[in-house]
Structures are given as structure tokens and as C-alpha cells.
């Protein structure tokens, strides 16, 4: 069942993609016997109810002939399809032969659309990369500044231990104050970068919408939904990244303050190793903050790649022969695979219905 539906998906993908290409309609007009038949076929397409195909997809293999009857007018013949063999194997073979012929003619259009949409999405990734690179540079710079500020205080504390406990304790208390001040300053500096990232996502995704519209196989309504969903997902991920960086700063502040307090306690007890241990722990905690934040920024970058690849498959699926064509559908005959197939078929049917409606109106208005 899934294999048959996968072939059906190939056919619908082809028709949905080619609706963006003028060459398809030239082929469509030439393959029909005369212009009057084309007009009648287009009028039949305009009267189809989108729900009819959706309902038929939920039937068992025994009802596949009804599904083929609804696809019949797409061939441009203007007549009912010939009788189908009653055995499932013969039906499957006939369907595969017809789909193979259509795929051979339309596959170049699908490949071109998939490539064009991919180029535009790659452009979006390039536009967002400077934001993440700048954020990583700021993290490294602020960590270095914090380390330098705290190192100066730590060295002074170590020297003062030779003179007296009171002086050392005072410097360790100053270290606690410096920790609070500098982590607070770093927190404030990150806010503008996070805001620029969110603003940049919104602007560049809208630019993507305009640039990908001529090449996408999806209808204008579904294209808008996909772009809006992409913008919302990336914005939420950018905001989550900013929140995680703030949490990292909170943790850093808490840990450094705790170590400074421990160092002050060690100074009161006359422990000469306190400041040395503190200096080492400060470096370790700062490097841990830097590492964790870099990992989170890298995860955000990979999320951008993943989301844009998913959008490419939605807006312009690759040809059936492509390695990226519905790999999850071909692995097993599972309910999940069937559900995904139905969801994509419903999207493609929406695209085809909108395209036929628009084209039908334009052809009927011709003198």
C-alpha cells in the first residue's frame, strides 16, 4: 500500500512542481486533441472538490480505482480511464507504468525547482551566519575580559596573604564584587546581539519568501504558511539561545561567588593555598562557560540547517529518483509512514487544486 502511495506521491509532486513552469502547460495543450477538449477538461478540474481526493486516500487498496478515476482527467484526455485489472498486481504494474512515463517528462522541472529553492535557502543560511559568528566572538571576548579582571584581583590577594589576613580577606571580598559587576555587564552586552539576531531572522526570511516564490511548487497560501512557520521556529530558537546564555551567566556568577567566599574563608583560617585554588577554579569556570555557550550556538546553527532543509522538501520536493525523495516513506510499511504520505498528498492536492483553478480561469477568459 505504501509503495503504491509513494508512486502516487511522485505523480502529484511532478504536477505540483510543473505548475510553476510554462513548459508544462505547453506540453499539456499539445497532448490534448484540440483546444475545446482542453477547455472542457479545465472546467472539469474547476468543479472537483478537494475533499474528494482526500477522502479517497483513506480507502483500502480495493478502492484505488476510484483514486485513479480522479487522476484520470489530469492526463488531458477528457475521457474516463480505461478499465483496470482487478488483480492488485496488475493494477500496481499499470499504475507504475503510467507514473514512470509522466515522471520521465516532468522530472527535469522538479529537479530545477528543487535546486532553485535550495539555492535561496542556502542564501538565507549565509545571511544568518554572521550573527552567530559575531555572537561567538563576543562570548570569547567577554570571557577573556572577565578572566583578566579577576586575575588581577587574584594576584593581589596572593601577595597580600604574605602581609596579613585582613588585607587578603578584603581583596577576596572585592573579588566577589568584581564578579557581580562584570557578569552583569556581560549580561547587558549580550542583549543587543540577541535582538539583532531575532530582527535579522525576520527580515531575511521575508526576503526568502519573495525570492523563492517563482520557483516553489507550493501554492501561494502554503508557501506563506511554510515561510511563517520557518520564521516562527527560528525566532523561538534564537530566543531560547539567548535565554540559555543568560542561564550560563547566572551559573557562572553563582559558582565564582561561591569560590570567592570559600577563598575568603580559607584566608581567615590562614590557608595559603586558598587564592591559588581560587585562581585555578576561576579559569576553569570561565572556560566551561565559554565551551558550553559555544556548543549552544553551534546547536542553533545546525537547527537553522535542519529547518531550511525541511522547508526545501515542503516547497519543492526532489524528483522521485533523487536520494532525498521521501526516504522515510520507503523504509517500512508503518502507520507513521502512511500518515506522512497522506499529509504530503493533501498538501500537494491543495497546490494542484489552486493551480488548476487559477489556470482554468485564465484559459476560460481567453477569446
From Swiss-Prot:
Phosphorylated by FAM20C in the extracellular medium. Residues 71-90 are annotated as: Disordered. One of its GO terms (cellular component) is very-low-density lipoprotein particle. One of its GO terms (molecular function) is phospholipid binding. The modification Phosphoserine is found at residue 56. Keywords: Chylomicron, Coiled coil, Endosome, Golgi apparatus, HDL, Lipid transport, Phosphoprotein, Secreted, Signal, Transport, VLDL. One of its GO terms (biological process) is lipoprotein metabolic process. Residues 1-20 form the signal peptide. It is found in: Secreted; Early endosome; Late endosome; Golgi apparatus, trans-Golgi network. Minor apolipoprotein mainly associated with HDL and to a lesser extent with VLDL. May also be associated with chylomicrons. Important determinant of plasma triglyceride (TG) levels by both being a potent stimulator of apo-CII lipoprotein lipase (LPL) TG hydrolysis and an inhibitor of the hepatic VLDL-TG production rate (without affecting the VLDL-apoB production rate). Activates poorly lecithin:cholesterol acyltransferase (LCAT) and does not enhance efflux of cholesterol from macrophages. Binds heparin. Belongs to the apolipoprotein A1/A4/E family. Interacts with GPIHBP1. Interacts with SORL1; this interaction leads to APOA5 internalization and sorting either to lysosomes and degradation, or to the trans-Golgi network. This is Apolipoprotein A-V.
Amino acid at each position: 500500500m505504501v509503495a503504491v502511495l509513494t508512486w502516487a506521491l511522485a505523480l502529484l509532486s511532478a504536477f505540483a512542481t510543473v505548475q510553476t513552469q510554462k513548459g508544462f502547460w505547453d506540453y499539456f495543450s499539445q497532448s490534448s486533441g484540440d483546444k475545446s477538449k482542453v477547455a472542457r477538461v479545465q472546467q472539469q478540474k474547476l468543479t472537483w472538490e478537494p475533499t474528494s481526493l482526500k477522502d479517497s486516500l483513506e480507502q483500502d487498496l480495493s478502492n484505488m480505482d476510484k483514486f485513479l478515476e480522479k487522476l484520470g482527467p489530469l492526463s488531458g484526455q477528457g475521457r474516463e480511464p480505461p478499465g483496470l485489472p482487478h488483480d492488485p498486481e496488475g493494477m500496481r504494474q499499470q499504475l507504475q507504468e503510467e507514473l514512470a512515463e509522466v515522471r520521465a517528462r516532468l522530472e527535469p522541472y522538479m529537479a530545477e525547482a528543487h535546486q532553485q529553492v535550495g539555492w535561496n535557502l542556502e542564501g538565507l543560511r549565509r545571511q544568518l551566519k554572521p550573527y552567530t559568528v559575531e555572537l561567538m566572538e563576543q562570548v570569547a571576548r567577554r570571557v577573556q575580559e572577565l578572566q583578566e579582571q579577576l586575575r588581577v584581583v587574584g594576584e593581589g590577594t596572593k601577595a597580600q596573604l604574605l602581609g596579613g589576613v585582613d588585607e587578603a580577606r578584603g581583596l577576596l571580598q572585592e573579588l566577589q564584587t568584581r564578579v557581580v559587576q562584570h557578569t552583569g555587564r556581560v549580561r547587558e552586552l549580550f542583549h543587543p546581539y540577541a535582538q539583532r539576531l531575532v530582527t535579522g531572522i525576520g527580515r531575511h526570511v521575508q526576503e526568502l519568501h519573495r525570492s523563492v516564490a517563482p520557483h516553489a511548487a507550493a501554492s501561494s497560501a502554503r508557501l506563506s504558511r511554510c515561510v511563517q512557520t520557518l520564521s516562527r521556529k527560528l525566532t523561538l530558537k534564537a530566543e531560547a539561545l539567548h535565554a540559555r546564555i543568560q542561564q550560563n551567566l547566572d551559573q557562572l556568577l553563582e559558582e565564582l561567588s561561591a569560590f570567592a567566599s570559600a577563598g575568603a574563608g580559607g584566608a581567615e583560617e590562614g590557608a595559603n593555598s586558598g587564592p591559588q585554588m581560587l585562581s585555578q577554579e576561576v579559569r576553569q569556570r570561565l572556560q566551561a562557560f565559554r565551551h558550553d555557550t559555544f556548543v549552544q550556538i553551534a546547536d542553533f546553527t545546525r537547527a537553522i540547517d535542519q529547518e531550511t532543509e525541511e522547508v526545501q522538501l515542503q516547497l519543492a520536493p526532489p524528483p522521485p529518483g533523487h536520494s532525498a525523495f521521501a526516504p522515510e516513506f520507503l523504509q517500512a510499511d508503518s502507520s507513521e509512514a502512511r500518515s506522512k504520505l497522506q499529509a504530503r498528498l493533501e498538501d500537494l492536492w491543495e497546490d494542484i487544486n489552486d493551480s488548476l483553478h487559477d489556470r482554468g480561469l485564465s484559459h476560460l477568459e481567453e477569446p
